[in-house]
UniProtKB/Swiss-Prot annotation:
Something else known: Is not encoded in all strains, and seems to be dispensable for replication.
Record flagged with keyword Membrane: yes
One GO term describing the cellular component: host cell cytosol
Superkingdom of origin organism: Viruses
GO biological process, one term: symbiont-mediated perturbation of host apoptosis
Name the UniProt record assigns to this protein: Protein PB1-F2
Subunit comment: Oligomer. Interacts with human SLC25A6/ANT3 and VDAC1. Interacts with host MAVS.
Compartments reported by the entry: Host mitochondrion inner membrane; Host nucleus; Host cytoplasm, Host cytosol
Pfam families hit by this protein: PB1-F2
The species this protein was found in: Influenza A virus (strain A/Turkey/Ontario/6118/1968 H8N4)
Gene: PB1
Amino acid sequence: MEQEQDTPWIQSTGHINIQKRENGQQTLKLEHHNSIQLMDRCPKTMNRAVMLKQTVCWRQWLFLRSPTPVSLKTRVLRRWKPSSKHGWTN
């Protein structure tokens, strides 16, 4: 699951497919479907942390697909502010 978190927007394009490992852990995989089907197929027993992670991943994917001018400005300012503390170099 760790490798899948590197590119969350790619994961968020489908419905959830749950697989059980030998040790009893559940593995979540996403397959291609639209957002309504994604929400409909979420298991009712999924814990809140996993559901929150899926929601955040889906929002990141939507942002990359169709960013608004306001969200772009916010994103740029967040990235620029920490680096602006160092000042400009010639």
